């Protein structure tokens, strides 16, 4: 099983890269992961609602193109309106995917959200939190949760939950 993280934006602060790299390194023996950075649409200084829709559309087309390159993989989209999963639920979903041989493309949208086209094609809409999180932080939280879920599946002592 492989998880590709399709993420809009590519200039992350050093602290984000450091945190992400730490969990990326730890997870490698348990799960193959790859990051595909998608350029954010160029934004106007004071964008209108129409501009925001155009940005989402442009980024959405790039996300779907990156997803199409891999062939068959489940499309999971991070969305505030998605279903919340406990870490244990995530571990179960990843375990099921591994048994079925499914690869996953996990989408972190742009600053203005994800296009309706991407949401319509999503196999899973997942909310990390009811809170609005900054996109750089989402990268770190996502990788840590993937690592935590895989540590559960591999009986690693990292997770000390129920």
UniProtKB/Swiss-Prot annotation:
Belongs to the RNA methyltransferase RlmH family. Its main location: cytoplasm. It catalyses: pseudouridine(1915) in 23S rRNA + S-adenosyl-L-methionine = N(3)-methylpseudouridine(1915) in 23S rRNA + S-adenosyl-L-homocysteine + H(+). Keywords: Cytoplasm, Methyltransferase, rRNA processing, S-adenosyl-L-methionine, Transferase. Specifically methylates the pseudouridine at position 1915 (m3Psi1915) in 23S rRNA. The gene is rlmH. One of its GO terms (cellular component) is cytoplasm. GO terms for molecular function: rRNA (pseudouridine-N3-)-methyltransferase activity. It holds the Pfam family SPOUT_MTase. InterPro entries: Alpha/beta_knot_MTases, RlmH-like, tRNA_m1G_MTases_N. It comes from the Bacteria. This is Ribosomal RNA large subunit methyltransferase H. NCBIfam families: PRK00103.1-4, tRNA_RlmH_YbeA. The keyword Protein biosynthesis does not apply. It is found in: Cytoplasm. S-adenosyl-L-methionine binds at residues 78, 109, 128-133. It comes from Psychrobacter cryohalolentis (strain ATCC BAA-1226 / DSM 17306 / VKM B-2378 / K5). It is an enzyme of class 2 (transferase).
């Amino acid at each position: 099983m492989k998880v590709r993280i399709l993420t809009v934006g590519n200039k992350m602060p050093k602290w984000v890269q450091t945190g992400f790299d730490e969990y990326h390194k730890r997870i490698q023996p348990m799960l193959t992961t790859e990051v595909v950075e998608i350029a954010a649409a160029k934004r106007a200084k004071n964008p209108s609602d129409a501009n925001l829709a155009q940005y989402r559309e442009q980024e959405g087309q790039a996300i779907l193109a990156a997803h199409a390159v891999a062939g068959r993989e489940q499309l999971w989209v991070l969305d505030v309106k998605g279903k919340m999963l406990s870490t244990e639920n995530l571990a179960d979903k990843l375990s099921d995917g591994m048994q079925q041989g499914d690869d996953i493309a996990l989408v972190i949208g742009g600053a203005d959200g994800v296009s309706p086209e991407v949401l319509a094609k999503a196999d899973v809409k997942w909310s990390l939190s009811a809170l609005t999180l900054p996109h750089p932080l989402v990268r770190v939280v996502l990788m840590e949760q993937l690592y935590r879920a895989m540590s559960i599946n591999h009986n690693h002592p990292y997770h000390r939950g129920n």
